[in-house]
C-alpha cells in the first residue's frame, strides 16, 4: 500500500513539475513585444495594486511573476524529490530549481526582443527557495498533525 501511495504522489509531482516548467519556459519563448503586451494586459487588471510603484509598476509585476512561478516550482520539486528519495534532501531540489532558472534565462537570449538577466536568475532562485521552505513547513505541520492522531488501526 505504501509503494502505491508513493507512486501516485510521485506521478502527481512529476506532472506538476513538467507543467510548471512548460509554462515557465513556454513564456520565455514568447517574443519580447508579445510578452510586453501580455504583461501590460495583466497590469491593467491589477493596476490599482501596483499604483504605489508608479511607473515601475509593470516592472514589479513581471518580477513578481518570475518569483511566483519559481516558488511553485520549488514547492513541486521538493515534493517530487521527497518521493524519489527516502531522505529529505536540501541540495537536489534547490540545484534543480537553480538549473531551471539558468535554462529559463538562456532561452530568453534566443527569443526575439528578449534578453537574459542575472537579476532574474536570483529572483527565480529566491522563489525556488521559498517554495522549498513552504513545502518543508507544510510537511512538518502534516507530520505533527499525524503524530498527534497516533497510528491508524
PLM feature spans:
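Membrane-interfacial alpha-helical segments at the cytosolic side of multi-pass membrane proteins
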Residues: 68-83, 126-142
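Short helix-capping/hinge motifs at transmembrane helix termini and TM-loop junctions
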Residues: 30-31, 82, 112, 139
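Interfacial helix-loop-helix junctions of multi-pass membrane proteins
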Residues: 101-125
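Short, charged juxtamembrane terminal tails flanking transmembrane helices
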Residues: 146-153
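Membrane-interface helix-boundary motifs at transmembrane edges
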Residues: 3-8, 81-88
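Small-polar-interrupted transmembrane alpha-helices in polytopic inner-membrane proteins
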Residues: 17-24, 90-109
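"…centered on the first transmembrane helix and the immediately adjacent amphipathic helix/loop
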Residues: 2-75
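Alpha-helical transmembrane segments of integral membrane proteins
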Residues: 8-16, 88-96, 119, 123
